[in-house]
């Protein structure tokens, strides 16, 4: 992994209080029995991990004993834990132990044939954890999830934790980490049953898994995890926060989030004054100011502030896309991308703008949209001062100054500043047109093309000219039209000086000087400078007249001929002479008339 993870670093001590989660009485009532048991196990695991790293909060005393065997029963009964003497000279401190004791007193411990004990092993500090005996019965053969220790119904987890200075190793995976956060956030390889990122989700790859989910063909040992996975595939988020509107698929995530509203933020950044409820969050935030990026990618050398972001980045190199859509089979490297994609199938847009009524499938999109109304553009270019509403727009813009084009087409070598533009370009080579109109079946290579095309069916023309009130279905068409009023012709021919409203018109004109006519008719051999001209010419041979007037049924080979013809029925005369006020139905008529005044 990253060099920063392999290099020996100074140990940073974290107290158990920093990772403990508290519930109020009201919140506790919302949890079912399985969730309470799960909460207890997680707290015990976190406590054991803290202890396995040496002193539980960093206090070291050479005269104190080591925490070799701590009984949860003793903690829950308010007694000081017993400890055997060891050369490690670490001790349970006065901070961590009371925190765990308070938590255990809150939990309703269910009577069972097995005793509830937590052990911290000898020199290798094996991680021993208590559990319910019925969990053991779920495994019929192979290596068990927990190992029974004599008469005590305590079980050993199938992984080892070593003291700081030695690598943390998963026996099944064989992957080493020199930082606790790296271990806790490690995405376990497919040899482990569930590839989740926290220790409490680890499972040995043997034994029966009775609950099967037909959508993704995955199986689970616990029904609660099975239900949670179903929500992940369906996109269901039934738990909604009444404070901010954020929704969650799991009650545990919802409860953690609710505590964030009422949590005291005691850890303040000395640089900007921003405060955090946890010291670990403050440490991560401070890297924004220091510029520290301790996690390096071994493939490309790119560095990151958080190990979780590094793990996500590495999927770029491995090509791993573990999150698959059950509707269309499309897969994604991040779960957030899959969640966004699902809205394309459901077409749900729950986030509506109170100003204009426009709706969005994600709250972040609504937040960005608000800046259209407020005019806030917080991201400014240091080169030219141009400001943007989104950081990604600024990044794309800065490439105009640097000339950076990191995305290269493997077919023709053409490079682009944005990955999305490269993807669109590659469809020129593949011929892919993935966006199909449900009305007429016409296909497009870009979603924007389909979106504009749909307006032809709905007759929607949202872009109106402020000069003549003529409306258009596309903004680009409106911009082009406005040059009729302004007289602006920004595209000038370098050979003859003739100027044009559109760049495409200039390109077509330049073929007059070069005499280039690459498009030849295979019927009569006549050649043209433009492909569109050849297409129109072929209709002479085929007799095709695709543009028909709905009023009289007359048909035409060109669309502009049909538009001109329609003025016969409407009586419209949009072209007016500025000299005498005479109007015409066609621009050519106005041009001929102007010669009268010139003469």
Curated annotation (Swiss-Prot):
Region Disordered: start-end pairs: 68-88
Keyword Transcription regulation: yes
Zinc finger feature spans (C2H2-type): 239-261, 267-289, 295-317, 323-345, 351-373, 379-401, 407-429, 435-457, 463-485, 491-513, 519-541, 547-569, 575-597
Main location: nucleus
Coiled-coil stretches noted in the UniProt entry, renumbered to this chain: none
One GO CC term, this protein: nucleus
InterPro entries linked to this entry: KRAB, KRAB_dom_sf, Znf_C2H2_sf, Znf_C2H2_type
Gene Ontology molecular function, alphabetical: DNA-binding transcription factor activity, RNA polymerase II-specific; RNA polymerase II cis-regulatory region sequence-specific DNA binding; zinc ion binding
Compartments it resides in: Nucleus
Magnesium among keywords: no
Function: May be involved in transcriptional regulation.
PANTHER family named in the record: ZINC FINGER PROTEIN, ZINC FINGER PROTEIN 819
Listed name of the protein: Zinc finger protein 530
Organism expressing this protein natively: Homo sapiens
Gene from which the chain derives: ZNF530
């Amino acid at each position: 992994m990253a060099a920063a993870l392999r290099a020996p670093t100074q140990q940073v001590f974290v107290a158990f209080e920093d990772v403990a989660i508290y519930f109020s009485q009201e919140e506790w009532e919302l949890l079912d029995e399985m969730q309470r048991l799960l909460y207890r196990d997680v707290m015990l695991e976190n406590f054991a991990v803290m202890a396995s790293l040496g002193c539980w909060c960093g206090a070291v005393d050479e005269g104190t004993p080591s925490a070799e065997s701590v009984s949860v029963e003793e903690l829950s009964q308010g007694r000081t834990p017993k400890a055997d003497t060891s050369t490690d000279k670490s001790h349970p401190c006065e901070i961590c132990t009371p925190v765990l004791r308070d938590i255990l007193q809150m939990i309703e411990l269910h009577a069972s044939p097995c005793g509830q004990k937590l052990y911290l092993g000898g020199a290798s500090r094996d991680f021993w954890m208590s559990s319910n005996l019925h969990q053991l019965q779920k495994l019929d053969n192979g290596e068990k999830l927990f190992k029974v220790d004599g008469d005590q119904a305590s079980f050993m987890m199938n992984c080892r934790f070593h003291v700081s200075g030695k690598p943390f190793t998963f026996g099944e995976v064989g992957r080493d980490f020199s930082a606790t956060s790296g271990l806790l956030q490690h995405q376990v390889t497919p040899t482990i049953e569930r590839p989740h990122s926290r220790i409490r989700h680890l499972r040995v790859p043997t034994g029966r898994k009775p609950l099967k989910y037909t959508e993704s063909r995955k199986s689970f040992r616990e029904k609660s995890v099975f239900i949670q996975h179903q929500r992940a595939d369906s996109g269901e988020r039934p738990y909604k926060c009444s404070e901010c509107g954020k929704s969650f698929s799991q009650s545990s995530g919802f409860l953690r989030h609710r505590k964030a509203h009422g949590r005291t933020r005691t850890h303040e950044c000395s640089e900007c004054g921003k405060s955090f409820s946890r010291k670990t969050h403050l440490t991560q935030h401070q890297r924004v100011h220091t510029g520290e990026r301790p996690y390096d990618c071994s493939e490309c050398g790119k560095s990151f502030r958080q190990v979780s972001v590094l793990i996500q980045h590495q999927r770029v190199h491995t090509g791993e896309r573990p999150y698959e859509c059950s509707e269309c089979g499309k897969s994604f490297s991040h779960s957030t991308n899959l969640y966004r994609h699902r809205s394309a199938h459901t077409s749900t847009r729950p986030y509506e703008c109170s100003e204009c009524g426009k709706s969005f499938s994600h709250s972040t999109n609504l937040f960005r949209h608000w800046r259209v109304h407020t005019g806030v553009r917080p991201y400014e270019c240091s080169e030219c001062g141009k400001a943007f509403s989104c950081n990604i727009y600024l990044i794309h813009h800065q490439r105009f100054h640097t000339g950076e084009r990191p995305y290269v087409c493997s077919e023709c070598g053409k490079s682009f500043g944005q990955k999305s533009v490269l993807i669109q370009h590659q469809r020129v080579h593949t011929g892919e047109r993935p966006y199909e109109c449900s009305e007429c079946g016409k296909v497009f290579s870009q979603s924007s093309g389909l979106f504009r095309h749909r307006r032809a069916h709905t007759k929607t023309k949202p872009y109106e000219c402020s000069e003549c009130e003529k409306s258009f279905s596309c903004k680009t068409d409106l911009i082009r039209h406005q040059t009729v009023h302004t007289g602006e012709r920004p595209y000038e021919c370098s050979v003859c000086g003739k100027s044009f409203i559109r760049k495409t018109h200039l390109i077509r004109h330049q073929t007059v000087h070069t005499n280039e006519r690459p498009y030849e008719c295979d019927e009569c051999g006549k050649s043209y400078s433009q492909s569109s001209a050849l297409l129109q010419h072929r209709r002479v041979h085929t007799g095709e007249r695709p543009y028909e007037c709905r009023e009289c049924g007359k048909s035409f080979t060109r669309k502009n001929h049909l538009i001109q013809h329609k003025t016969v029925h409407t009586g419209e005369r949009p072209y007016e002479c500025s000299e005498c006020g005479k109007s015409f139905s066609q621009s050519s008529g106005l041009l001929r008339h102007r010669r009268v005044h010139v003469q």
